[in-house]
């Protein structure tokens, strides 16, 4: 009888240790299980509405520039580019500095929601350039950017800022 009792204690101890080690190892988070936040770059690269802007960003090595903190991107969607007769090929045929300036003229270095934007000048990422925001005279709740564009989709949130989708590019391209 003593031999069976001795084996039973070891078996019970083994089961308890196995049970607790199973609990401990199953509760650890793996990096692959964690949902990573999307930056402005990630949103642009994954959203089919921004295929023209995506091509411009990728061709001009701007992915990292849009991963910095506290940005507001006024992003023209594909329809905005099409209605303005601007293609990614036209932008990418510019010098690299001009193409980068085209994108940077759509970005302010502050995270602004639509509700916090005021009628004023906001400096863009291009030194000496700004976006002028005014109200539409017929509808004071509608904001006009540089006298050209309206925000058509408000407050697309990203981990490092906000995207305001606009109906026209803020830069005239010839």
Describe the function of each predicted region.
Residues 2-13, 21-174:
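Mature, structured domains of secreted/extracytosolic soluble proteins
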